[in-house]
Regions:
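All-alpha prenyltransferase/terpene-synthase fold signal
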Residues: 1-323
Length: 323
């Protein structure tokens, strides 16, 4: 059985060895640029680890792992256009480097590349794998639409927000672990349980992202307070609004939209309100709740506990971050 570091290396090597045609250059160069951009490789790692719970042959999962990474990067290309984001992983985003039309078309080609990779799975599993992938892909689009809808919606509830991030973030993790489990020979029941594991893990991961954006360690290089400056409806903002009295809610609205405030002043004012309302602690409680639920589900799988240890270790490493 490979270590997690060896699995990640195998995924990186597989992606690096993937060849794209030289022409048309403006179609394929952005794909290679995007896939070589690094990142956590979270989704392909979850897929291969899930396969490894049920099978010692995790190499069989590499094409599907590359497929979910390709799909993830397709969503990033289009997300960056919708968000007008000029930077991705410390480098110019594809649309900033090559233009919007190129980014759209290269993203579409990356999606097709993902399907091509998936078509290599064993024929007896192909219908189930494609069904899982298609459901996952459509739900990610639904989540993105809800996220855009929230920008125009004056009030968003915690329930609505959790539903949105489940679709936008968690279902891609869930689809990845289910496909990996299928390739490893898991039962339908174990696939269902792993899906729930990944949903809970994804919710914990996204809530932690929300928290770290405002309370991460700035010494580690990431700017703090980006969500506040953008006025994004995060778990922190929504929780603050739901716990505040009307006077405090108005203070929060004013802090978000006051053009006279500098960036540092805006971040400071909003965080002081969060602190007063105990929002960081409430968020940490929800993160811990979701993460503990995820780990407890691993205990219910029909395999020896030793088979899930690498998945457990990886999940714990994801949540042990400061930025």
């Amino acid at each position: 059985m490979q270590t997690n570091e060896q699995m990640l290396s195998a995924i990186e090597n597989y992606l690096a060895q993937t060849e794209f045609p030289a022409e048309p250059e403006l179609l394929y160069a952005p794909i290679g640029y995007s896939l070589a951009g690094g990142g956590k490789r979270l989704r392909p790692m979850l897929l291969t680890l899930s396969c490894g719970i049920f099978s010692d042959d995790v190499k069989q999962a590499l094409p599907a792992a590359a497929a979910v990474e390709g799909f993830h990067n397709f969503t990033l290309l289009h997300d960056d256009i919708m968000d007008n984001a000029a930077v991705r992983r410390g480098k110019p985003s594809v649309h900033a480097k090559w233009g919007q039309n190129v980014a759209i078309l290269s993203g579409d080609a990356m999606m097709i590349y993902a399907y091509r990779l998936l078509s290599s799975v064993p024929a007896n599993l192909l219908p189930q794998v494609l069904s899982t992938f298609n459901t996952m892909a459509l739900e990610v689009c639904e989540g993105q639409q809800y996220d855009m809808d929230f920008e125009q919606k004056p009030k968003v509830s915690v329930v609505e927000y959790m539903h949105m991030i489940e679709l936008k973030t968690s279902v891609l993790l869930a689809g990845s672990v289910v496909i990996g489990a299928m390739l490893g020979g898991a039962s339908d029941e174990d696939c269902r349980r792993l899906r729930r594991f990944a949903v809970e893990l994804g919710l914990a991961f996204q809530l932690q992202d929300d928290l770290l954006d405002s309370y991460g360690d700035q010494r580690l290089g990431k700017a703090i307070g980006g969500d506040i400056l953008e006025g994004k409806k995060t778990y922190l903002m929504i929780t603050a609004m739901s716990h505040a009295d009307e006077a405090t809610r108005e203070m929060l609205r004013t802090a978000y939209r006051d053009p006279a405030l500098s960036d540092a002043e805006k971040i400071g004012k909003v965080k002081s309100i969060y602190d007063r309302l105990d929002v960081p602690r409430l968020t940490e409680q929800q993160i811990q709740l979701r993460f503990e639920r995820a780990l407890s589900i691993l205990d219910t799988l029909s395999v020896a506990p030793s088979r899930t240890q690498r998945m457990r270790d990886y999940a714990m490493s994801l949540m042990d971050r400061k930025n």
